[in-house]
C-alpha cells in the first residue's frame, strides 16, 4: 500500500506568506506614491508619536488637558453660560500661540471682540487676523481658506450660535428655519476636519448654551448648531464661573474677579473629566500667579499654614492676594516654582528635563559634599576634645 505524502504546512505558509508580504509592500508603496507619505501607517508607528499641542495659555488647563495643551490638527469646543469666560479662555490660547511665533486668526461672528481687552490678555492685536463675517457660510468659508493655506496655527470661531445661515438672514423674522444651522455646521465639519488634521491647525469653536423644552430627567442644557460639532471635536470644555474674588471688607467689598471652573467633558488624547480652577481677574484675564499658587500648594511646593504661604521655609504672604503679589514682584521665584510644577506634571520638553536632572544631580552632590565636610569637622572637634 502506497504511503500518503505528508503535507508540510510550514512550507506553504512561508511561500504564501512571502507572496502576501510582497503584495502588501507593493500596495503600501503605491498608496504612499498616490496619496503622500503617512497616508497609511501601522498603528504601532502612530502610537509612538507624541501628540503635538499648543498651550492653552493657562498652566492649570494645560495640566487638566493631560497632553499639555490643545492638540494640533484637532477641533476644540468651548461652551458655557453667558459671561462665564469662554472668549477669555480662547484669547489666552491666541496669546500663547503668538508668543511662540505662531499665527492666529479670530472669526468674530458675534461682532463683540474688544481689542483693548485682548491686548490686556497678551494678544498682539497688530498681528491677529480678524474677520467679522456677514453670515455663517461666509465665516466658515474664511476659516476653511485660512486652514487649507497651512500658514495659520490657530483659528478661533466666536461663536457657533452667531453663525447664522444666509437663508435665515435673507428671510423675514418669523420665517421657519428649522435645521438650517445644523445642516450648515454638519457640512462644514465634514469639509474642515480633514483639512484641520492635514495642516495641523488647531480650530477652537466657542459655543453658547440653550435649554431643551420638556426635559423631565437629566440636564436640559444643550449647545446650538446640531450634533456634528460634538462628534468631530476631540476636546470639549465646559466653562462656568463659580466664586467671586473680592477685595476690601464690609461695605467696601469690591468684586475684582471670579474663580472659574473649566471641566474637560470630552478628551480624545488624554483621560477626560479633569477640572481646572482658574482665577479670572477683570481687565487682566486668567491670573498666572493665582493658578500657580493653587497648584503649588496642592503639590506641596508651597506650604500653607492657616492664612500664611511659605516657600523654602520663607513666608511669602498672609492671604492669597498678598502671596500672589509676592510672586508678581519676584519673577525669579515665580519661574522657579513654575518649573517645579511643570516638571511634576511632565510638561517639560526633553532639553528642560535634562537640565532639571543636571540641577538635581548638582544639588545632591553639593548636599553630599556639605554633609561630608560637616562630618570631617565633627571628627576634628572630637579629636581635639580627646587631646
From Swiss-Prot:
Annotated signal peptide = none
- What domain of life does the UniProt record list for this protein's source? Bacteria
Task: Look up keyword Chloroplast and say if it applies.
Answer: no
Instruction: Provide the GO MF annotations for this entry.
Output: ATP binding; ATP hydrolysis activity; ATP-dependent DNA damage sensor activity; damaged DNA binding; single-stranded DNA binding
SMART domains associated with the record: AAA (SM00382)
Compartments annotated for it: namely: Cytoplasm
GO terms under biological process = DNA recombination; DNA repair; SOS response
User: Which positions are annotated as binding ATP?
Assistant: 80-87
**One GO cellular component from the entry?**
cytosol
| Protein name according to UniProt | Protein RecA
